[in-house]
Amino acid sequence: MEALVYVFLLTGTLMVIFFAIFFREPPRIAK
């Protein structure tokens, strides 16, 4: 059960960091 908690926290942290960097910088994909 603890493994699922660690995976959930790790995924959540990565998603938060990804969205923070993506929304902070202007998206270069959509011209």
From Swiss-Prot:
Quote the subunit structure annotation.
PSII is composed of 1 copy each of membrane proteins PsbA, PsbB, PsbC, PsbD, PsbE, PsbF, PsbH, PsbI, PsbJ, PsbK, PsbL, PsbM, PsbT, PsbX, PsbY, PsbZ, Psb30/Ycf12, at least 3 peripheral proteins of the oxygen-evolving complex and a large number of cofactors. It forms dimeric complexes.
Taxonomic placement = Eukaryota, Rhodophyta, Bangiophyceae, Bangiales, Bangiaceae
Keyword Lyase attached: no
InterPro entries according to UniProt: PSII_PsbT, PSII_PsbT_sf
**Which locations, inside or outside the cell, does it occupy?**
Plastid, Chloroplast thylakoid membrane
Question: Might you report a single GO cellular component term?
Answer: photosystem II reaction center
Q: Which family does it belong to?
A: Belongs to the PsbT family.
Instruction: Provide the primary localization.
Output: plastid
The function of this protein is: Found at the monomer-monomer interface of the photosystem II (PS II) dimer, plays a role in assembly and dimerization of PSII. PSII is a light-driven water plastoquinone oxidoreductase, using light energy to abstract electrons from H(2)O, generating a proton gradient subsequently used for ATP formation.
Q: What is this protein called?
A: Photosystem II reaction center protein T
State the organism named in the record. Answer: Porphyra purpurea (Red seaweed)
Superkingdom, natural source: Eukaryota
Q: Where are the transmembrane segments?
A: 3-23
What is the primary gene name for this protein? psbT
One GO biological process from the UniProt record?
photosynthesis
Give the SUPFAM superfamilies listed for this entry: Photosystem II reaction center protein T, PsbT
Membrane topology recorded in Swiss-Prot or TrEMBL:
Single-pass membrane protein
